[in-house]
A protein has these predicted regions:
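Glycine-biased, small-residue-rich flexible motifs in mid-sequence functional cores and linkers
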Residues: 2-4, 79-385
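Short, small/acidic-rich helices and loops at N termini and domain boundaries
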Residues: 1-84, 367-384
Length: 385
């Protein structure tokens, strides 16, 4: 099988079957792969003649041009069968056939190094919701196994979760309902770029380039958020909203769902209270409770008993010395996320040539950021460990 041709075919199928990925998977399994669906006689697509009509050479030509533009723009397209594809999302019965990714590090570094916890909720959040969204993310940053924070880059809970994660040195991933080159809302363009530059972070979508933010697209985005994460935390939600759909998707994928309780007379808490009442979500009673349920270890309080994060001291120190887009920052944060990593594994995680890995790791060790053992496995040096 020609891998490049198969990726082109997957990109084409992703456009055709974006709202019916499970159907595409069934067709691929029966035909023996994505490219096999574009033969002289495309297989019948029962109930969807409009989809069958698109299984032709013109769509493959479009996909080839699409992938060229993606690469030229500095983005990545990851097919469902690629080893870089998010492992939890691949386990879902209806995973996207491909993902467009924008980040400064390798997809493996984004998707495979640590647990992923989604924070979702209303755009119209209350001061109570904002406070507890921040406190919970801050507390998770102080656990033994800090997670990656996943959300949807929207106003309200999404934006607070992403920004707090960055402030605490946590990686964070934003799932968009637009093309990878568009950020919606536009007011979050700076936030998205900060995420793209941060180690272990980035933004992604399953929509082709040029896709506008129409309402229907957000259902697919919510499905991806639920599939990416080990657990979903609903911070605030009205009785109807996208975050409740995300919670239901998560339940269908056998993910853990948590909800922050709110006042009985606050419409912005009706959805959370209903999830708890109907036993569709576990109640969040404290940051310690959430961390324990997630299996991340007990969070350690900061000075004065506060959950406030330290601002990502290790990351800040690396950025100050080497720059926000430096190889030193990327490699240092990869070691911080996965201590005891050798040069070969770092080469795969960070995507640098082996000699450059040794050069950068040696510099970080000489500057007091890393230590190594006799097997040349690197870990953060005290006090960063």
């Amino acid at each position: 099988m020609d891998k490049n041709k198969e990726i082109v075919a997957l990109c084409a199928l992703n456009k055709i079957f974006g709202y019916h990925p499970a159907l595409a998977l069934e067709l691929m399994e029966n035909a023996g792969g994505a490219l096999a669906l574009f033969g002289p006689e495309p297989p019948p697509v029962k109930g969807h003649p409009e989809l069958q009509a698109q299984l032709g050479p013109r769509m493959l030509e479009w996909a080839a041009r699409e992938l060229e533009q993606v690469q030229a723009s500095g983005f990545r397209f990851i097919g469902l069968r690629d080893e870089d594809y998010p492992p939890l999302l691949r386990e879902c019965p209806d995973p996207p056939l491909g993902l467009y990714v924008n980040g400064s590090c390798s997809p493996t570094e984004i998707f495979s190094l640590r647990p992923m916890v989604a924070f979702v909720g209303t755009r119209d959040m209350s001061p109570y919701g904002k406070t507890w969204c921040r406190r919970l993310v801050e507390a998770l940053s102080r656990t033994r196994n800090p997670p990656c924070i996943v959300s949807g880059l929207a106003f309200g809970v999404d934006g607070i979760a992403h920004r707090t994660a960055l402030e605490c040195g946590l990686p964070t991933v934003g799932v968009m309902a637009t093309g990878i080159e568009k950020v919606y809302p536009r007011q979050h363009e700076r936030l998205a770029m900060d995420m793209v530059r941060a180690p272990g972070s980035g933004v992604l979508t399953d929509y082709p380039l040029g896709t506008a933010p129409v309402a229907l697209n957000f259902l697919r985005r919510n499905r991806i958020i639920a599939g990416l994460a080990d657990a979903v935390v609903v911070v605030e939600s009205k009785s109807k909203g996208g975050s409740l759909m995300t919670a239901k998707y998560a339940m269908g994928y056998n993910r853990d769902v948590f909800a922050v309780p709110g006042r009985l007379d606050d419409v912005r808490s009706e959805g959370c209270n209903s999830l708890i009442h109907e036993h569709m979500a576990d109640i969040v009673t404290s940051p310690e409770d959430l961390a324990a349920c997630l299996g991340l270890g007990a969070p350690v309080r900061g000075a004065g008993g506060s959950w406030a994060c330290s601002g990502g001291g290790f990351q800040d120190a690396l950025s100050k010395k080497y720059g926000d887009a430096s190889d030193e920052l990327r490699l240092g944060m990869a070691v911080k996320i996965q201590p005891g990593t050798g040069p070969e594994a770092l080469q795969k995680l960070v995507g640098l040539p082996y000699p450059r890995i040794l050069e950068v790791a040696g510099l970080l060790e000489a500057d007091g950021f890393l230590i190594s053992d006799f097997l040349r496995r690197f870990s953060p040096a005290p006090p960063w460990d």
